């Protein structure tokens, strides 16, 4: 990145920020879709039941922990690969 001029660095930063936002929104969408379809079965009420709320909380926690672990493993792999 040191070899890029200021304009190129700014463009690269914008591209990376847009990609990061897209990935975040994709993760949020996946989490929402998965947890909703796994936990919400009763559509007779406009509010979530206690059981549904607990299920969604557990589902979201599990999903986020899994995503964090995958990120850690990727970072470990990348560090090992770059060290070769």
From Swiss-Prot:
A motif (Twin CX3C motif) lies at residues 35-59. Pfam families: zf-Tim10_DDP. GO terms for molecular function: metal ion binding; protein transporter activity. Disulfide bonds join 35-59, 39-55. Its main location: mitochondrion. It is a peripheral membrane protein. Signal peptide: none annotated. Keywords: Chaperone, Disulfide bond, Membrane, Metal-binding, Mitochondrion, Mitochondrion inner membrane, Protein transport, Translocation, Transport, Zinc. GO terms for biological process: protein insertion into mitochondrial inner membrane. GO terms for cellular component: mitochondrial inner membrane; mitochondrial intermembrane space protein transporter complex. It is found in: Mitochondrion inner membrane. It comes from the Eukaryota. Belongs to the small Tim family. Heterohexamer; composed of 3 copies of TIM9 and 3 copies of TIM10, named soluble 70 kDa complex. Associates with the TIM22 complex, whose core is composed of TIM22 and TIM54. Interacts with the transmembrane regions of multi-pass transmembrane proteins in transit. The twin CX3C motif contains 4 conserved Cys residues that form 2 disulfide bonds in the mitochondrial intermembrane space. However, during the transit of TIM9 from cytoplasm into mitochondrion, the Cys residues probably coordinate zinc, thereby preventing folding and allowing its transfer across mitochondrial outer membrane. Mitochondrial intermembrane chaperone that participates in the import and insertion of multi-pass transmembrane proteins into the mitochondrial inner membrane. Also required for the transfer of beta-barrel precursors from the TOM complex to the sorting and assembly machinery (SAM complex) of the outer membrane. Acts as a chaperone-like protein that protects the hydrophobic precursors from aggregation and guide them through the mitochondrial intermembrane space. PANTHER family: MITOCHONDRIAL IMPORT INNER MEMBRANE TRANSLOCASE SUBUNIT TIM9B. This is Mitochondrial import inner membrane translocase subunit tim9. It comes from Schizosaccharomyces pombe (strain 972 / ATCC 24843) (Fission yeast).
């Amino acid at each position: 990145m040191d070899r890029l001029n200021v304009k190129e660095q700014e463009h690269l930063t914008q591209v990376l920020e847009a990609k990061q936002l897209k990935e975040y929104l994709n993760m949020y969408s996946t989490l929402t879709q998965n947890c909703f379809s796994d936990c919400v079965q009763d559509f007779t009420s406009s509010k979530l039941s206690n059981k549904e709320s607990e299920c969604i909380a557990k589902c979201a926690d599990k999903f986020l922990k899994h995503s964090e672990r995958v990120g850690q493993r990727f970072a470990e792999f990348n560090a090992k690969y770059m060290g070769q």
